[in-house]
Amino acid sequence: MKTRILSRHVLLISLTLTWLSFSMAHSACRNPNVAGDSPFVTYAAASGPVEIKWFGHSFFQITSSLGTKIITDPFGSMGFPMPEVWADIVTVGREHGNHNNVSLVKGKPVVLKGLKEGGNEWDDINLTYRDVLVYNIPVHQRGVPNYATSLKGAAFIFEVDGLCILHSGDISEPYNEDQLQLIGHVDIILQVIGGVYTIGPEGALKIIEQLKPKIVIPMHFWYTTGLLERFMDGTHRSRVLDTNSITVSKDTLPPATEIIVLKVNRVGDL
């Protein structure tokens, strides 16, 4: 009898701890008028440090304080070192070899593609995985160099440890009003500045004015093209790091927009 009572108490304690490890939270990023302000279930809300690591082009790894790993736009052969990575989530903004090399990523990640099979129609993504919320925003990329066509792609928002991180995707123009409504609040932008096929430095600066993030990390550019110098035009405080990663939390965000340039070597630079 005593054994039965003890077992019941152990079970109740276990269930209580399991319940406490989850929390209902309203999104800090999504516009409640768009999202319906519906709460989502996460593990106990964390607000610890988030690591953002850049491998080149549009390829990042975002790691939450609880260890959840997100990979964005893994590339194929582009002249960058090929990292050995594993992830819980992989996002693909467009179907191109520079962005969709999912096979590179180890583990059994959930793969989220901004476009449906065939790449002609946008998908609607809204996923909660452990302590991370992921949703996407439809964008357009310029098609061919004469801009005669426009290709579809997707930007992604990651809500991690209370931070709202936007991966811009291969966007070609500043956001329109509908896109801004879908995006919501942004703390950090991983921002394309490459020009030609995507938005260039001047257009990217307009996006900063639209979203007013605290941190902007430029991507999708080569150091030798002068694009970075045009982007760091003195409008915002900027710094160049001698590393390919930063660690940031809600409490360590700068008071005003800061451009942070991460360093990635190409194979020939090693």
Task: Set out the residue ranges of the language-model regions.
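Core dinuclear metal-dependent hydrolase active-site scaffold
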Residues: 26-85, 89, 113-184, 244-270
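Glycine/Thr-rich phosphate-binding loops of Rossmann-like dinucleotide-binding domains
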Residues: 80, 99-101, 199, 226
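Active-site neighborhood of phospho(di)ester-bond hydrolases with catalytic His/Asp-centered motifs
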Residues: 71-74, 86-107, 112-114, 166-169, ...
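Bacterial N-terminal signal peptides
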Residues: 10-21
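N-terminal secretory signal peptides that target proteins for export/translocation
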Residues: 1-6
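Cap/insert and terminal regions of metallo-dependent hydrolase folds
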Residues: 173-265
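P-loop/Walker A phosphate-binding loop and immediately adjacent motor/lid segment at beta-alpha junctions
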Residues: 44, 101-134, 205-221, 233-241
